């Protein structure tokens, strides 16, 4: 399984060398930038939370991944269309849905595939219908999240934030129905940390959903997603970062135990005495 993951990753990287070279320049520029804007996902949330996730989780934690707005198309709460569609007149990626949902689904599927290859107990969910009027319908993201969170699953919903000036940036909006854990903390370290009571407490987090805003759907991030030459590597890079954060939260790297230093006996050892008998140079007086 680990071999399959490595081969898949090598294939993606080999097909995208030119793009990755550009990425390297972007990363170097970001490192020198006082704002520290991420070269892939852009700025982190401008509203920063102060919570800390400390609860340890089981190494066999079950993870459920949802695509935000999967059941609310052509109705209130359909998600953002992105700057390309709204401001630049571009055609939607799929006329049945807002661009945000199109990309949410792509990231969800890539994350589930990567996570499984890397040993995570992870699965995705799709309501099977783009518009479900009743939030209490058992097929909606909210209903499924409430049930699975009560069973102890970690429920993560993928989102892209609105474009400027409406959006805030990348980051995790954590659940409100439980104590925050190491996975929440790891995702916040990787993407940013929204206030726990963002907008007074959203419906998803009240039902056990951690909302992961990948970034504002605009600029370089949106351009790389829309460009067929860079689309796959961008999706995989985002999914890879999420998978890394999930793994680190579930199986944190422990500091290696200090090796016991050998005890040094007092006085000269026998080997030293024997050498001195045969090597007068060892008897140097200062």
Write out the residue ranges for each language-model feature.
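Catalytic-site microenvironment of enzymes
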Residues: 2-286
């Amino acid at each position: 399984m680990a071999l399959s993951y490595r081969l898949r990753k090598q294939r993606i990287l080999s097909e995208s060398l030119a793009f990755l070279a550009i990425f390297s320049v972007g990363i170097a520029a970001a490192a020198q930038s006082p704002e520290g804007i991420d070269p892939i996902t852009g700025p982190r949330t401008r509203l920063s939370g102060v919570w800390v996730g400390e609860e340890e989780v089981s190494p066999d934690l079950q993870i459920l991944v949802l695509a935000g707005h999967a059941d609310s198309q052509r109705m209130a709460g359909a998600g953002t269309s992105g700057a390309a569609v709204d401001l630049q007149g571009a055609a939607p990626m799929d006329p049945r849905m807002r661009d945000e949902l199109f990309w949410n689904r792509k990231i969800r599927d890539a994350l589930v595939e990567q996570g499984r290859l890397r040993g995570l107990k992870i699965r995705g969910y799709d309501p099977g219908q783009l518009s479900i009027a009743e939030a209490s319908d058992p097929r909606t993201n909210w209903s499924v999240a409430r049930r699975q969170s009560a069973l102890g699953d970690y429920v993560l919903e993928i989102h892209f934030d609105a474009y400027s000036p409406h959006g805030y940036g990348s980051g995790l909006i954590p659940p409100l129905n439980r104590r925050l854990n190491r996975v929440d903390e790891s995702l916040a370290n990787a993407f940013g940390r929204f206030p726990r009571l963002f907008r007074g407490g959203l419906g998803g987090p009240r039902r056990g959903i951690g909302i992961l805003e990948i970034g504002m759907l605009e600029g370089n991030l949106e351009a790389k997603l829309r460009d067929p030459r860079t689309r796959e590597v961008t999706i995989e890079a985002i999914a890879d970062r999420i998978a890394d954060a999930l793994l680190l939260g579930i199986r944190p790297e422990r500091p290696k135990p200090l090796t016991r230093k050998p005890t040094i006996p007092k006085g000269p050892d026998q080997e030293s005495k024997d050498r001195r008998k045969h090597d007068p140079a060892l008897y140097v007086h200062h």
